[in-house]
Amino acid sequence: MLFSFRAIVLFYCCMLTFAGIGFLWNPKFVVESGLVALIGASMEVKPLIVTQDNLSTLALSGLVFLILGMIYTISLLQSNFLFFSGITPIRAIFDFILTGFIYLKKEHIASNSLTFTFAFCDLMWQFWMFAAMSEERAKYLKNQKKAEELAARKAREVEES
């Protein structure tokens, strides 16, 4: 793999935190960014227009992104591989369904360029994390096997004494 699993997750945490701060600080900057416009236009999804009515929704989205960034950062610092191996496929399936729904139902209220860009980019990151997870999974299983062997050896030593 070009980047390690930890590097991919760390960059993903930074992106979530940046998006969260962007939505809280200046949501118009995030909504009107080039990536959102490019992906939205390429999929022919209507653009989201920032108004006074949807500022609270964008701020709530910013808080959700910040919380997600903190959850992923804490799990990364704890080396909680089981969290990532459980949540990554679920998030990928959810993002795939959301992306397909937005593309097929272009008149729905949730179908806009910002939502599609988030779902598409998040799907890309989840697949990338899942692909990089194979190396991490091998290390985790190796450490688990060593821990089980050590526990069995200690149990035999206790029985012998």
Curated annotation (Swiss-Prot):
InterPro entries (alphabetical): Incr_loss_mito_DNA_1 (IPR018815)
Major localization class: endoplasmic reticulum
Lumenal side: 28-56, 103-112
Cell cycle among keywords: no
Transmembrane segments: 7-27, 57-77, 82-102, 113-133
Coiled coil: none
Cytoplasmic side, ranges: 1-6, 78-81, 134-161
Organism domain of life: Eukaryota
Keywords per UniProt: Endoplasmic reticulum, Membrane, Transmembrane, Transmembrane helix
Subcellular location: Endoplasmic reticulum; Membrane
Family assignment from sequence similarity: Belongs to the ILM1 family.
Name of the protein described by the UniProt record: Protein ilm1
Organism (species): Schizosaccharomyces pombe (strain 972 / ATCC 24843)
